[in-house]
Amino acid sequence: MSGPSRTQRPMSPLRAFFHHETSAGLVLMACALAAIAVANSPLAPGYFATLHAYAGPLSVQHWVNDGLMAVFFLLVGLEIKREILTGQLATWGKRTLPGVAAVGGMAIPGIVYVMLNLNNPDALRGWAIPAATDIAFALGVMSLLGSRVPSSLKIFLAALAIIDDLGAVIIIAIFYTANINVATLLGAVFVFGILRSLCAANFQDLRIYLALGAVLWVLLLVSGVHATLAGVLLALTIPITTASATPDPSRQTAPLHRLESLLHAPVAFAILPIFGFANAGVSFASITPAIMTDTLAVGVAAGLLIGKVVGIFGAVALMVRLRLAELPTHATWLQVLGVAFLCGIGFTMSLFIGLLAFEDPHMQDRVKYGILAGSLLAGVLGYGILRIAGRRAL
């Protein structure tokens, strides 16, 4: 039997990806509902006190949002790198349709939000909140439909969401970075340079990469750049090829694939559920009918529910009409519409951007109302449309 190729990866990575993402979506959904229930129960004071309690230099909530989510962004970065180099986004032809759809699905929600908040300057900083898609939630809902949805549509949704994640990372880096400490930022650049050099030399020891990644995280945290970006930067430096010759069987799989395989379960079943439980809790005790006219909450909900659909479905329709792309194999227009609605589930990344955009707890709560309402409606409508479309296809 011939030895492993230099780009060998674990068996069925796409199947493993869908398995983890769909299961993670269901677990995340349960934790989000649990957080809402606790926040509206007699346990609420203890819940919020625990989140705001300090453990060392950061509060518990900050450790979750800045620390654990850096690991989530590391996994996101690994998935983006893998898909661009060897996967569903490896050629421009494969990138075109989900790429254009992702751009439309980020731009139009932002425009919808801004239009509704033109007279509310304080709220404009949240323009990017409805631009995000939660791939775990979206694939989790899609998994409930089983064989009613063609696999090509699942791949399209995954590719679209991965590009969407890349866009969200860029937005966070550019628009949601605080005052910069130049000295520590230069230190972070130096560490990143070391990581790039190790990658260029195809250095295989993940322990060294992770140790330097931890140093990079600390430097970015102190510098004012959001520390979670350390995860993405580290991912860019993890080699995707194996050493030309290694007697160690554990090293016959590329470091990127080893690390991605190692992180999938902890991120899916620990980090994302913890994030959801720590951030989805919002009290409805003070909610009034006035929330229906609150442009911040309505802007987020409308961006997710209307902006995503118009942006994604419109972009796909334009590309197909201009004969620049074709619909995913065996997919119908009604199914594409259903996927566009599912992309309006913006939970994890939308919450994350909302917390970066606003420090005022009251504004954060209004953002959460909008995210919950928009994501719930988008998920229900997307599921319903795909279920109807699946019956027609049978």
Swiss-Prot record:
Keywords: Antiport, Cell inner membrane, Cell membrane, Ion transport, Membrane, Sodium, Sodium transport, Transmembrane, Transmembrane helix, Transport. It is a multi-pass membrane protein. Its main location: membrane. It catalyses: Na(+)(in) + 2 H(+)(out) = Na(+)(out) + 2 H(+)(in). It is found in: Cell inner membrane. GO terms for cellular component: plasma membrane. Gene3D superfamilies: Na+/H+ antiporter like domain (1.20.1530.10). It comes from the Bacteria. Signal peptide: none annotated. InterPro entries: Na/H_antiporter_dom_sf, NhaA. GO terms for molecular function: sodium:proton antiporter activity. GO terms for biological process: regulation of pH. It holds the Pfam family Na_H_antiport_1. The chain crosses the membrane at residues 24-44, 58-78, 96-116, 126-146, 155-175, 180-200, 214-234, 267-287, 300-320, 336-356, 370-390. HAMAP family: NhaA. Belongs to the NhaA Na(+)/H(+) (TC 2.A.33) antiporter family. Na(+)/H(+) antiporter that extrudes sodium in exchange for external protons. This is Na(+)/H(+) antiporter NhaA. The lineage of its organism: Bacteria, Pseudomonadati, Pseudomonadota, Alphaproteobacteria, Hyphomicrobiales. The gene is nhaA.
